Amino acid sequence: MSYGIYIGRNLTADGVAYLAGYGDEPSSHWLEINPRQAHAEGSTITVGVTPQADMPGVLTEIPQAAETLRNMRVSYSYYLGVPAPLTNGGLNECGVAVRDHWRTSRKELIEMTPTDQTGPHYSDLARLVVDRAP
């Protein structure tokens, strides 16, 4: 289960927004500090989940951005069927913050999800935001 707390800048005495979160994944967590990086034209990154995930899927490649932003994020090492490292959330040099959230879906939505689904999962989306969002 994941939890997140957001307090907007209009609700704090100092005008600073706060974003916090907690995830109870059964794995190691660590802080990463990543520099701004240039990537070769045609580079890709792997996203998605494996057939072992609770909601199975297929790993796929998507284009890597030409440049990713300097950021710090919390990563973790394990969630069944999701390749490590996973991103809990973070903050980039532009002040964009993100926190991943996982929640189960309604039974009928789970049943209609194909077992060969592709595309970014919740942790991939958090990583993409801290890497790319200006």
Q: Could you describe each region identified by the protein language model?
A:
Residues 119-134:
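A conserved hydrophobic secondary-structure block that centers on an alpha-helix together
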Residues 2-123:
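A contiguous strand-loop segment
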